[in-house]
Amino acid sequence: MDLDQIVADAQQSFEGAADITTLENEKARFLGKSGALTELLKGLGKLDPETRKTEGARINVAKQQVEAALNARRQALADALLNQRLAAEAIDVTLPGRGAGAGSLHPVMRTWERVEQIFRSIGFDVADGPEIETDWYNFTALNSPENHPARSMQDTFYVDGKDADGRPLLLRTHTSPMQVRYARMNRPPIKVIAPGRTYRVDSDATHSPMFNQVEGLWIDENVSFADLKGAYTDFLKKFFERDDILVRFRPSYFPFTEPSAEIDMMFEHGKNAGKWLEISGSGQVHPTVIRNMGLDPERYIGFAFGSGLERLTMLRYGVQDLRLFFENDLRFLRQFA
């Protein structure tokens, strides 16, 4: 029984195996059910006890040597496969790197921050309020009686639930409720803007069910339309970064201001030269609203204005369709990065 030859043959066969499949086939020749060493182990039963003990020990040593050679070759093949994969996935550190994509503000948020910065620079505070508003703050406090058309389901999103007095809750239709909320917590002189999201049942190229608005309020003992025109004209020139802007006031109607006016602007030069563009609603704060602020309308007077942040953004960047701001198309948004 030439065990040394069997071990040598096994080691040579294993070493010559180029892959795991071939190696397993070679293993069967020596360690399988009909393998050389297996057959020798089966034949031990025919030997006398003393010889069986001696030969059994020799066969087990040979088997251990074959298994050691088998495991060594398995590890070598596994290492070779790993090295091959690593080589295929290797990164050439000498290649130029790829620039990471940098995020940027949404164009409407750029406008939001710019509006805040400009009004802060001319002495206005910035306030924020709840988007789910009470019926009283959204309508009644702003001189909109209970039968006002704006309260209908066609224009306002009502939500489940009531306020502490049992009145309906709604998604605010403007940021104007902050006029009353802020004035009740601060004494005149009051100069504040309130940017924020608002909601109305409306959707087309120039309207969205959700849009952003900035409300402005100035309350003091001697405030006039001249102050409104001066402050808003100064804002427009800083926002659009140009001085060739004309501003006009057109009579209008808003329940919370009297008199009321639409604010139009016109560029004297450039693409939109000579065109009056509607930019904001405004007016002198209605005495009823001042009274609801907890102030004496015989003593205090002021003005308010409301501008759509999407509208300002559209005019600044020449965007024609409001809906583009909400479609999250990176091809569109990257233009403002």
UniProtKB/Swiss-Prot annotation:
Cofactor entry: Mg(2+)
First-tier enzyme category under EC: ligase
A Pfam family it matches: Phe_tRNA-synt_N
Compartments, as annotated in UniProt: Cytoplasm
Catalytic activity: tRNA(Phe) + L-phenylalanine + ATP = L-phenylalanyl-tRNA(Phe) + AMP + diphosphate + H(+)
CC terms in the record's Gene Ontology section: cytoplasm
Cofactor remark from the record: Binds 2 magnesium ions per tetramer.
Keywords carried by this UniProt record: Aminoacyl-tRNA synthetase, ATP-binding, Cytoplasm, Ligase, Magnesium, Metal-binding, Nucleotide-binding, Protein biosynthesis
Binding residue positions for Mg(2+): E258
EC number(s) on file: 6.1.1.20
InterPro entries recorded: aa-tRNA-synth_II (IPR006195), aa-tRNA-synth_II/BPL/LPL (IPR045864), Phe-tRNA-synth_IIc_asu (IPR004529), Phe-tRNA_ligase_II_N (IPR004188), Phe_tRNA_ligase_alpha1_bac (IPR022911), Phenylalanyl-tRNA_Synthase (IPR002319), tRNA-bd_arm (IPR010978)
GO BP term, pick one: phenylalanyl-tRNA aminoacylation
Disulphide connectivity of cysteines: none
GO terms, molecular function: ATP binding; magnesium ion binding; phenylalanine-tRNA ligase activity; tRNA binding
Domain of life: Bacteria
Main subcellular localisation: cytoplasm
Oligomeric and partner information: Tetramer of two alpha and two beta subunits.
Family: Belongs to the class-II aminoacyl-tRNA synthetase family. Phe-tRNA synthetase alpha subunit type 1 subfamily.
Name by which UniProt lists this protein: Phenylalanine--tRNA ligase alpha subunit
Biological source species: Burkholderia mallei (strain ATCC 23344)
